[in-house]
A protein has these predicted regions:
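Short glycine/serine/threonine-rich phosphate/pyrophosphate-binding segments
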Residues: 55-58, 94-103, 121-124, 220-224
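Active-site segments that bind and position negatively charged phosphate/pyrophosphate groups
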Residues: 188-307
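C-terminal charged capping/lid subdomain of soluble metabolic enzymes
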Residues: 2-13, 256-359
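ATP/NTP phosphate-donor binding region
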Residues: 1-88, 157, 164-167
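A glycine/threonine-rich phosphate-anchoring loop and its flanking beta-alpha core
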Residues: 103, 107-195
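Non-transmembrane, aqueous-exposed alpha-helical and coiled segments at domain scale
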Residues: 77-84, 119, 220-229, 325, ...
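A short, small-residue-rich loop immediately preceding and capping a beta-strand
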Residues: 82-118
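Short beta-strand/turn micro-motifs composed of small residues
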Residues: 49-50, 93, 116, 149
Length: 359
């Protein structure tokens, strides 16, 4: 099934007969030109939402008499103080800004176009998001939107976009491995790695984000977000390095520590998570997984080791956009990943007593 077949497209009266770009659902255009055109075609006021890093995207149209500009500060609630008559919303920035604009569009029943600042296209395709609304974070529905990619503005983001595709492939491996342990439904292996042209990377990320509406995202995405929150450069690449090393070591030579029980409560306290969500396996589940490991070890070890062998070539490609290395960096979040993703492959490794190394 092609990307266009999975794209849910919402037409809005503000732009009757709106052009949704190429058949894969993405529009490739300069931000200024596209935003100016949408503003000129709007029947009412247009809300421009951006974060501090992307506010220049709308500089050319911000002074238009029908434009209302907002710099998003992390709380979505102030958006709803906008006056009546807003008929469309344009958003530029990271995933949270795009989520905020799409939630506003969903509540107001208006159209929305987003200009992602990340080549991962996170924020553009999710069906739901978690946003700060006043004093608490709440899961909210998100409107469908048009997605416009300005390749020139994204020039500094393609390393992360490429690395996110690596995590998508790793998530597919993780899903199949978990299925072998009796967890989840499994998945078909993904086809060969895509071309590395910049538009190819954007199209593949759009495809992946759409698949993730109904398929596991993988614990690599969670690890990347944890690393990103700490300001780590190209966090998707660091997450990929760490997890490929972990998976390869586990399937190649990991042996369950038969009489060792992880201190689940202490691990949850260190991670700041809820102990009740740890997902502790029953004795029967543990035995089944230990037996399954020996049955599938060789097959998954070969695939995991192939990921490790390919890292040098990927590192070279990534360095064309941003200098990266083969050093995985700080492993603190990797060690605590089972507490953040209790249904991931690292949790199975933890349950075997193999996530207790010293930092």
């Amino acid at each position: 099934m092609g990307l266009a077949d999975r794209t849910v497209r919402k037409m809005n009266s503000a732009f009757d007969g709106e052009d949704y770009g190429s058949e894969d659902g993405l529009i490739f255009c300069e931000t200024e030109a596209d935003a100016r055109e949408r503003l000129s075609r709007s029947a009412g006021k247009v809300l421009l939402v951006s974060d501090e890093t992307a506010c220049s995207a709308f500089a050319a149209i911000a002074s238009h008499p029908r434009a209302l500009s907002v710099v998003f500060d992390g709380d979505c609630l102030p958006l709803f103080s906008m006056p009546d008559g807003v008929s469309y919303v344009l958003a530029s920035g990271g995933s949270e800004v795009l989520h905020a604009a799409r939630y506003f569009a969903e509540v107001r029943g208006i159209g929305c176009t987003v200009y992602p600042a990340l080549a991962t296209l996170e924020g553009a395709y999710e069906l739901k998001g978690t946003l700060q609304l006043g004093g608490e974070r709440t899961q909210v529905p998100l409107a469908e939107c048009s997605v416009v990619c300005d390749v020139q503005r994204l020039k500094g983001a393609f390393a992360r976009g490429y690395a996110r595709l690596l995590l998508t492939r790793l998530a597919n491996f993780e899903t199949r491995a978990l299925s072998a342990f009796g967890i989840g439904q499994g998945a078909e292996p993904l086809p060969s790695f895509p071309e590395t042209g910049e538009e190819d990377i954007l199209r593949e990320n759009a495809n992946a984000r759409l698949r993730e509406r109904f398929a596991p995202v993988g614990e690599g995405a969670t690890l990347a977000k944890l690393l990103d929150a700490c300001g780590k450069p190209v966090p998707e690449w660091q997450a990929y390095l760490q997890l490929t090393s972990l998976y390869a070591a586990f399937f190649e030579k990991g042996k369950p520590r038969r009489y060792f029980t992880p201190d689940y409560r202490a691990r949850a306290e260190r991670a700041g998570t809820d102990y009740n969500l740890a997902g502790v396996p029953t004795a029967e589940e543990y035995v089944f997984r230990a037996m399954a490991l020996e049955r599938v070890r060789a097959r998954f070890a070969r695939e995991a080791l192939s990921f490790v062998k390919e890292r040098e070539a990927h590192c070279e490609k990534l360095s064309a956009w941003e200098q990266v290395s083969l050093h995985g960096g700080d492993l603190t979040f990797l060690k605590r990943l089972p507490e953040y993703e209790p249904h991931g492959l690292s949790a199975v490794i933890r349950d075997f007593g193999l996530m207790e190394w010293e930092l």
